[in-house]
Amino acid sequence: MRILITNDDGINAPGLEVLEQIALELAGPEGEVWTVAPAFEQSGVSHAISYTHPMMIAKLGPRRYAAEGSPADCVLAALYDVLQGARPDLVLSGVNRGNNSAENVLYSGTVGGALEAALQGLPAIALSQFLGPETEGLADPFECARTHGARIVRLLLERGLWDGEDYRLFYNVNFPPVPAANLRGHRVAAQGFRRDTSFGVEPHMSPSGRRFLWIRGGAQQSPTLPGTDAAVNLEGFVSITPLRADLTAHDRLAELEALIG
């Protein structure tokens, strides 16, 4: 098996090392693991692509590259340059430092990397490690993802749904904020929504008198509706959410047509 991995936390992020370990276990001794990851932090860039300026790319070692671009850029760089046409069997993005549940899905560069792979017709999975009070004292905050990641990916490869639609199905996996031994299992869960925890701004003044703003997110420990992704994560379960890039509100098409068609 040939596996391509990327992330949004950058080439030196600890979560990427976790994903490399997961990918090597899945690929086996006869397989290949290729890493093409951002040279710098790209958290929050979603599915951005850098088509207005050139993307520098550097080979760091065997099958290991850093690109000065987003996770989606890295997937494109891998498919159309680094791999020289040898398409991967699977694309993994992560393991993100922090959850990509609920509304975070829309901002996540980790999800954006998997989304681009899906648009390119490839099986893709985004993986993230929810952090919280129970992970703060761990020597390895990624312990849950490191221990259970390969098993969850293998489960999806062997028993998950995969299709060839134009907006191809891909998966968003979040590991709960618990030690590996405390994992309660996994749940298929819809994307949730944390009320009153959306992004906002925090104003400041520089020593020179210039006003500046920090973008700040809301409380990540707020649960979503029962059975949705963040809710099951906070209950100690891995959440597995099938996604598509198609943002059409299909449940409203007929109603809107009746009103204005």
From Swiss-Prot:
Note accompanying the cofactor annotation: Binds 1 divalent metal cation per subunit.
Entry-linked InterPro entries: SurE (IPR030048), SurE-like_Pase/nucleotidase (IPR002828), SurE-like_sf (IPR036523)
EC number: 3.1.3.5
Organism domain of life: Bacteria
Coiled-coil residues: none
Cell compartments where the protein resides: Cytoplasm
Record GO terms (molecular function): 3'-nucleotidase activity; 5'-nucleotidase activity; exopolyphosphatase activity; metal ion binding; nucleotide binding
Binding site for a divalent metal cation: D8, D9, S43, N96
Family recorded in the similarity comment: Belongs to the SurE nucleotidase family.
Designated name of the protein: 5'-nucleotidase SurE
Gene name as annotated: surE
